[in-house]
């Protein structure tokens, strides 16, 4: 019974750490780039877009498809960075244990 109480306390402590980490992740931002920096997207580690920056040289009707592709690439670049940060933070909280969330 004593071991069970210890496990329960550990689980509660880990849950609190995960909640704290999730709140902290909302404040961390990453910036994705494409086209040599002509397109930039800033988003939170949780995936919320904070800003999109497009160099004025790309704002021509004939560049529309290129801009669309670059925006998508910049987003994917930022999302990849966000996923890496989330994985790193989760490892810090769980001590490297693989959890199903």
Swiss-Prot record:
One GO CC annotation: cytosol
Role of this protein: Binds to DNA and alters its conformation. May be involved in regulation of gene expression, nucleoid organization and DNA protection.
The protein's organism comes out as: Beijerinckia indica subsp. indica (strain ATCC 9039 / DSM 1715 / NCIMB 8712)
Q: Give the UniProt keywords, A-Z.
A: Cytoplasm, DNA-binding
The superkingdom listed in its UniProt entry is Bacteria
GO molecular function ontology, one term from the record: DNA binding
Question: In this record, what's one Pfam family?
Answer: YbaB_DNA_bd
**Could you tell me where this protein is found in the cell?**
Cytoplasm, Nucleoid
Give the record's family classification.
Answer: Belongs to the YbaB/EbfC family.
Stored Gene3D superfamilies: Nucleoid-associated protein YbaB-like domain (3.30.1310.10)
UniProt main location, coarse: cytoplasm
Name of the protein: Nucleoid-associated protein Bind_0255
Whether Transmembrane helix counts among this entry's keywords is: no
Subunit organization? Homodimer.
Tell me if Cytoplasm is a UniProt keyword of this record: yes
